[in-house]
Curated annotation (Swiss-Prot):
Catalytic activity: (R)-4'-phosphopantetheine + ATP + H(+) = 3'-dephospho-CoA + diphosphate
Protein residues bound to substrate: T9, K41, T73, R87
InterPro entries: Cyt_trans-like, PPAT, Rossmann-like_a/b/a_fold
KW Calcium (keyword) present: no
UniProt similarity note: Belongs to the bacterial CoaD family.
Annotated positions for site Transition state stabilizer: H17
NCBIfam families tied to this protein: coaD_prev_kdtB, cyt_tran_rel
Disulfide bonds listed in the record: none
BP term (GO), one: coenzyme A biosynthetic process
Name of the molecule in the record: Phosphopantetheine adenylyltransferase
C-alpha cells in the first residue's frame, strides 16, 4: 500500500490545500493529512477545530485520513507507515524553503521521499495568512475556502455577524 502524509498547520484549510490533497490521492492509496501542533505559531483555530474543518472538507475523499501530530514530520510519517511527504508549492519563495526542508528530512529519514505538487494557477496566491487578514477586515473570502470554513473564520473574527 502506498501511503503519504500531507503535513501543515491548515489554519485554516484553503481551496489550494484541498486541490493539492485531491491531486495527491491520484498517486497514493492513502493520504494522511497531518495537522501540526506548532508551538512557534499562534493559530486562529485549535488543533481539534482544524481537524474538524479538514474532515468536513475532505469527507468525499475516501482514501484521506486526518490526524493531528506534534514533533518531527518524518517521525510521524514513519509512525503512519508512509514513504512520502506531499508538499504544495505556490511560487519560487515556497520552493527555496521547501527544498531546504526536504533536504533536512532526507538526512533524517533517507527512506522517505518528499514530493512537490505545484498549485493550480488559480490558487497560487492563496495563503491561510492572507485569508485570515482579509476576513478580519470583513473581506469576501468565499472563493478561497469552502463555505463551512468561511463561516467558521467569520465567527472567530466577527461573532456579532449572523450566518
Amino acid at each position: 500500500m502506498r501511503i503519504a502524509i500531507y503535513p501543515g498547520t491548515f489554519d485554516p484549510v484553503t481551496n489550494g490545500h484541498l486541490d493539492i490533497l485531491k491531486r495527491a490521492t491520484e498517486f497514493f492509496d492513502e493520504v494522511i493529512v497531518a495537522v501540526a501542533v506548532d508551538s512557534n505559531k499562534t493559530t486562529l483555530f485549535s488543533l481539534e477545530e482544524r481537524i474538524q474543518l479538514l474532515e468536513t472538507a475532505a469527507e468525499e475523499l475516501s482514501q484521506v485520513k486526518i490526524r493531528g501530530f506534534e514533533g518531527l514530520t518524518v517521525e510521524f510519517a514513519r509512525q503512519c507507515g508512509a514513504n512520502a511527504i506531499i508538499r504544495g508549492l505556490r511560487a519560487m519563495q515556497d520552493f527555496e524553503y521547501e527544498f531546504q526542508l526536504a533536504l533536512m528530512n532526507k538526512k533524517l529519514a533517507a527512506d522517505i521521499e518528499t514530493i512537490f505538487l505545484m498549485t493550480q494557477s488559480e490558487f497560487s496566491f492563496i495563503s491561510s495568512s492572507s485569508i485570515k487578514w482579509a476576513a478580519s477586515l470583513k473581506g469576501n473570502i468565499s472563493e478561497f475556502v469552502p463555505p463551512h470554513v468561511e463561516r467558521a473564520i467569520y465567527k472567530k473574527y466577527h461573532p456579532e455577524i449572523d450566518d
